[in-house]
């Protein structure tokens, strides 16, 4: 039964991702038609056609391999300068040959009556809207999905409230991680922190969230820490202690360990609901993380490929494909550690984050990504 749930969760999530990709292409299709660009095809998937139907001049359909989608806008590439619109018979150099090949493919779809309806003939601002329409659609989808999850079910967030105080300093490599015999107490234990304490100030700075508290601890290294907590409704100044330096996962690259301050407490995790402002903050945080991941993406892909060749274990923080995300969704669906509501919320949160990633990835200013065409339109406008 667990296997059936796993497969079902993975398939449903994969279908939702493909629907998102289909809507991404709608984001290109609609403004293209509004601006009069000739659109010959709208397909979800690649390879052999499973189903199609022609409406007007556009053929809509589904293909065998559900690994993406496309909209064919006629005239994406302008003719070579000084030509009559057709391609040269001979090309010199590999890059010119590639460009001429692309122009040749475009010419096959151009008919005598298409003048004025070709993509390259449109104004720069129209090209910009058409090409940005896809990524913007994914951003809208991400916002709607995350707003639904946050507003209806809520999101689990760490609070600036102590859930558990760690008794002693136990190295991660220690053979016995349960005994405190002969080991020093943690700074939190020395300060007299208790479960249920709400942290309201750290070194005189008001604390309003766990993220703020976590950053304060990490950057404090081995310096003095003065904690103020709210205990049983009373404000309590705890004895000052020094945080200690230890190796913790890097905020931006969890696979890397960095030196940071350590206090020795675990925060309370509670489900919180929120509105558009909360979702906007979450999406901005996701955007920062995604942008950092995109910068490191080429190196991560190289390392993953090298590990496949050499047989080394795959980095758990390495690149994840749509199939990999679907597997993760299947694991969430099959687990018995959370209830059904939490599973649905987790799946849609993952779907929202995938949509945001697709949007940001497509904004990368390189062809054949949407960002490459957007960069070209901006260059023309300037």
Q: Which residues fall in each region the model found?
A:
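Conserved PDZ fold ligand-binding element
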Residues: 183-210
